[in-house]
C-alpha cells in the first residue's frame, strides 16, 4: 500500500492567532478615527449579520470595500508585508507550536483563511507555511475594486480552494486540520482528522 503524504491545515483568525486580522489590519491602515467612522456607519448591517439576516460574506465584502476600495494595490501589498510584523503578538502559542512541529517533520503546512491573502501570506512565508485565502480584486489601473476574486474563503469554499491547490488527488493525502469556528466545519469534516480548537 502506498504511503499517504501528510499535510496539515490551519485556520488563521481564532486558531493560529487570537485576533481578527481583518479588523486589526483595517484599524492600522485607516487609523482609529476613520476605522470607527466606517464601523459606526455599518453598525446596522453588522447587527443584521449577527442576527443572521445579512450573510456574513456580504457584510465582509461591504466592509472591505468601505475601507480599501480605490487603494493602489502595491501600497496595499506593502501594508500587508508591514502588518506581518504585528502578527507575532497575537499568536496562539499551543496551536502555533503544532504548526511548527509539523513543518519541522517535513509536512506541508497550509494556512486556509477567510482573511485576505495580501496581509496573511507575508507572515506565512516567514514561517514556511503556504497560504490559501480570500483574494482582493484589482482593476486594470492597479487599484482595489472593493470586491473579491471569487468567493470569500470560508466554509465549503475552503475545501474547494485547498482541493484545487493540491497537486495530487485527495486520496493521496492524510489531512489533519485545525479550526475554531462555524466557517471551518466543512474543512474539519473533509480532513481525516479535524480538531476544533477550544482552549488550546
Task: Walk through the language-model features, giving the residues of each.
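C-terminal cap/substrate-recognition subdomain and adjoining C-terminal extension
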Residues: 1-5, 78, 85-200
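Conserved alpha/beta cores of soluble small-molecule-handling proteins
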Residues: 32-35, 51-55, 73-75, 93-96, ...
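Short hydrophobic/aromatic-rich motifs at helix boundaries and adjacent loops
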Residues: 16, 32-36, 67-72, 89-93, ...
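Cysteine/selenocysteine-centered motifs that mediate thiol-based redox chemistry or coordinate metal-sulfur cofactors
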Residues: 47-59, 63
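A broad detector of the eukaryotic-type serine/threonine protein kinase catalytic domain
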Residues: 27-30, 81, 149
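Metal-dependent phosphoesterase signature
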Residues: 59-94
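Active-site neighborhood of HAD-like aspartate-dependent phosphohydrolases
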Residues: 1-52
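A general boundary/transition motif marking the beginning of the first structured unit of a protein
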Residues: 13, 51-52, 64-68, 87, ...
